[in-house]
Every structure is written in C-alpha cells, then in structure tokens.
C-alpha cells in the first residue's frame, strides 16, 4: 500500500 501512495505523490 505504501508503495502506491509514494508513487502517486511523486
């Protein structure tokens, strides 16, 4: 889940 949020932010 954290991976998706990190990519979305970038």
UniProtKB/Swiss-Prot annotation:
Disulfide bonds: none
Main location: secreted
Keywords: Amidation, Neuropeptide, Secreted
Tissues expressing this chain: Expressed in the antennal lobe (at protein level).
Modified residues (Arginine amide): 10
Keyword rRNA-binding: no
Localization annotation: Secreted
A Gene Ontology BP annotation from the UniProt entry: neuropeptide signaling pathway
Origin: domain of life: Eukaryota
Keyword Transmembrane helix found: no
GO CC annotations on file: extracellular region
Protein's name according to its UniProt entry: Tachykinin-related peptide 6
The species this protein was found in: Acrosternum hilare
